[in-house]
Amino acid sequence: MTAIIEKVLSKDEVREFRAMLDKAAWPDAKAVATAGSLARLVKNNQQLDEASPLAVDLGNRILRNLGRNDQFTAYAHPQRLYPPRFNRYTDGGSYGFHSDSALLHVANSSVVIRSDMSATLFLSEPDEYDGGELEIETASEVEVVKLAAGDMILYPSGALHRVLPVTRGARVASFFWVQSMVRDAGERSLLYELDQCVQQATIAMGAGNPTVQQLAAIYHNLLRRWADT
């Protein structure tokens, strides 16, 4: 299951991010350690130096916004997040089909993140570039994603996915990984659907309604059963 989280960044924040990112140095990303050995063979893009003050500052701003985003919390149940990184595709840049590494070592630390979910936060508007669609293979179809700047998609890190060649303009994005308190993707999906039912029932019937309270209790009991902290 994938989820689109809208307006992680406002349009003003996107413009501010892009004003700084467009002036930055963008080295070839093939040697970057976040890609496994097989993924590097199909990787053809650019990536901002993850240790640069700009990458750290913008990444921290994204994390602060996500910390205030109820939909992200309800869907992901985040336990740990890999610090956001930034990439750019231009002049035919692409990334062939691959799945993300299961375990990711955070640079200059002893922290290891299990990649349960991958996130792409779009920083270019769809009309700024041709191509560059994110394709994600699910059990039943190939999902094609090209979102408005400031919007983000979450998808299972184990799913095969690729970025199609960018033939005009530049596709700029932030990407990172989430380790969830709820490891199983099916359990996360059920919890999210139940959470949405609780929210809708609360609006329709009021928080004091016995049915709403029972639904909320079921949600929290399932979360208690499935979550690791």
Regions found by a protein language model. Name each.
Residues 1-85, 190-229:
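Non-heme Fe(II)/2-oxoglutarate
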